[in-house]
């Protein structure tokens, strides 16, 4: 099991990178080359389970712990959710200690898992990937399938043809009710004894879409998430599972087109709490996040040629996207602030406020309103004086923060009706 790329592999990856950039110029280099339509980027917790067997207590899963996570759900290529496609679930854990393997980001405190709603990938190696991307770059702008690659695959790898033809054929009821797989393998430990694949399995209690199939529009998958997390205010729960394999030969590692027959075991639980996730700021945050399987601890390093392709192509396309959008690419800390759950108690709302101010709030709450039950009450005393003073005071519409400026030329992506979270500025959100 080796991760050292040969000169042929390096040349192939460089060609794939150039083809990917060509595709991005077609869709707009400010967008992701793949999975550019997101349904939502949500806050979640990732809880490593207690009492795991010894062989599973490795790296990230060595001890029980709860991580803050961001999860981005997306379509692979389609704008219209009603059309069949591959769908993505990208998970970013924050607060993960330990040195990471991505060059230049070894000290980052994040760890990524990149998954899709199909258990296997349709490409075996770099040379096949080059052939596919070259044909795809020619056919995609015309809205046509890569017919030349399909013909080549039928002749040379007929067993892989059903994998390719079925790859983008999923129609989801809800992103929260689907199963997802890593497709490609990863190490499980510092040695070469075990490889693994990851999968995410939804709880049976996760709601499916309440939108009947005949009423589904091109954006119904985000609506399904909103129905579940915001309107019904229900959590979405998933098992995070690993599938270990003792066969770490190149035949197994470099063939992601075949499912493994080994057992699948739960090692963590993902909980997405009820939340509102559709603000302009949070959607922009999700668009600006970069996910790569190489944001990882050494114990969980990506294996095989396809992961080597992803390492360089993901990094290159992410760099192009952020440069085009004039956004600095930064990893999140887990302390980004949005109103994930608007149902706050009075105690939570007044946390950190001193007692004097709480007393003022209590006094205001106890004061009878000027208008009550349709009967107009005449203000007296200090209330009357305050009203007269207020009526003489000029009203200023100038915002206290440039982010809230009325001008449509504002470059801040924070909604003007809300207080701008400072961490959103730190993430460098682009113009709307």
Curated annotation (Swiss-Prot):
The keyword Transmembrane helix does not apply. InterPro entries: Catalase_sf. It comes from Sinorhizobium fredii (strain NBRC 101917 / NGR234). Transmembrane segments: none annotated. Keywords: Plasmid. This is Uncharacterized protein y4iL. SUPFAM superfamilies: Heme-dependent catalase-like. GO terms for molecular function: heme binding.
